Curated annotation (Swiss-Prot):
Glycans are attached at residue 60. Belongs to the fungal hydrophobin family. SMART domains: HYDRO. The keyword Signal applies. This is Class I hydrophobin dewA. Forms homodimers at high concentrations, and these dimers are off-pathway to rodlet formation. Dissociation of the dimers into monomers, with resultant exposure of the hydrophobic face, is necessary for self-assembly to form functional amyloid fibrils called rodlets. Self-assembly into fibrillar rodlets occurs spontaneously at hydrophobic:hydrophilic interfaces and the rodlets further associate laterally to form amphipathic monolayers. Keywords: Cell wall biogenesis/degradation, Conidiation, Disulfide bond, Glycoprotein, Secreted, Signal, Sporulation. The keyword Calcium does not apply. It comes from Emericella nidulans (strain FGSC A4 / ATCC 38163 / CBS 112.46 / NRRL 194 / M139). Aerial growth, conidiation, and dispersal of filamentous fungi in the environment rely upon a capability of their secreting small amphipathic proteins called hydrophobins (HPBs) with low sequence identity. Class I can self-assemble into an outermost layer of rodlet bundles on aerial cell surfaces, conferring cellular hydrophobicity that supports fungal growth, development and dispersal; whereas Class II form highly ordered films at water-air interfaces through intermolecular interactions but contribute nothing to the rodlet structure. Induction: Expressed after 12 to 24 hours post induction of asexual development, which correlates with the development of metulae and phialides. Not expressed in hyphae and strongly induced during development. One of its GO terms (biological process) is asexual spore wall assembly. The gene is dewA. GO terms for cellular component: extracellular region; fungal-type cell wall; spore wall.
Length: 135
């Protein structure tokens, strides 16, 4: 009986200490403090901040390549074949190929961009690619 109680107490303690890490892992990009810090200082008054991958990375990822080919993702201006998605779309579709998970929460994996409403091209903004990346 003591063994079972000890085992349950250990399991509860291990689960409680693991919760903060898993909570950060399950955080949404659109509400991530780490993403807000990554995009800090950028202005995008004409649309939404988005995460983009380079054409080389997009071509290596069959899911992103398929979404880009179907016109579901915007492209980065000047980089035909790149994939960009708004934070809300990344959260809705679970496009994890565009996101790195850090201890503070999710951030854009490669390029932070501004995607004007009503266009298919996004423009890289200040701090593009300079955000915190998980090693």
């Amino acid at each position: 009986m003591r063994f079972i109680v000890s085992l349950l107490a250990f399991t509860a303690a291990a689960t409680a200490t693991a919760l903060p890490a898993s909570a950060a892992k399950n955080a949404k990009l659109a509400t991530s403090a780490a993403f807000a810090k990554q995009a800090e200082g950028t202005t995008c008054n004409v649309g939404s901040i988005a995460c983009c991958n380079s054409p080389a990375e997009t071509n290596n990822d069959s899911l992103l390549s398929g979404l880009l080919g179907a016109g579901l993702l915007n492209g980065l201006s000047g980089n035909t074949g790149s994939a960009c998605a708004k934070a809300s779309l990344i959260d809705q579709l679970g496009l994890l190929a565009l996101v790195d998970h850090t201890e503070e929460g999710p951030v854009c994996k490669n390029i932070v961009a501004c995607c004007p409403e009503g266009t298919t091209n996004c423009v890289a903004v200040d701090n593009a690619g300079a955000g915190t990346k998980a090693e």
